[in-house]
Amino acid sequence: MLFRSADQRVDISPREGQLYTDNRPDGDMLPILRQAVASTDSSLFVVLHMYGSHMDYTKRYPKDFAFFTPDDASAVNRETKDKVRNAYDNSIRYTDYVLDQVISVLDSTDAVTALFFCSDHGEDLMDDDRNRFLHASPTPTYYQLHVDSFAWFSDRYRELLDRKSTRLNSSH
C-alpha cells in the first residue's frame, strides 16, 4: 500500500501480459536508487520491493552468480533437490549482493540513513520428511514462517540517534 500511494514510484515489474516470472533482476533497481539519492537534498523515503528468491530460482540471479552448482533443476522432486537448493542459495547470494550495494549507496552520502530489510515469507525446500516445496500452503511450516530481517544504520545515524539505535540493536 505504501508503494501505491507514494508521490513518486518506479515499477520494474513485468508489463501487463508478461509472465510474473519474467521479473527483472532486483539489481536493476540500483541505478534508480543511486539517482534518487544523488538528486535529493531533502528527506527521502525509499521502498525497494524486491522479488527476491522465488521459483524459478535460476531466473532470480545473473549467471555469474551461479556459485553453487549444479543449479539446473528442470523439475522439482527428490532427485533434483540438491540442484533446487543450489539455485535457491544462489538467489540468496544475489540478494545479499544487492543489499550490500544498497548499503553502499546509503553509506556514500553524508545523510542520516537507515535500511530495514524483511522477507515476506520463508520457503520450503524439501527440508524434512514431508518434502514440501515453496510457500503459502494452508498449513504453514516453520520454514515458511521463519523470515530473515535486519536493520542497518549509517555512522551518522548512530551518532545522532545513538540511544534509539542502541536500544533497537540490543533488542534482537
Where are these regions (language model features)?
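Catalytic domains that recognize anionic headgroups
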Residues: M1-S170
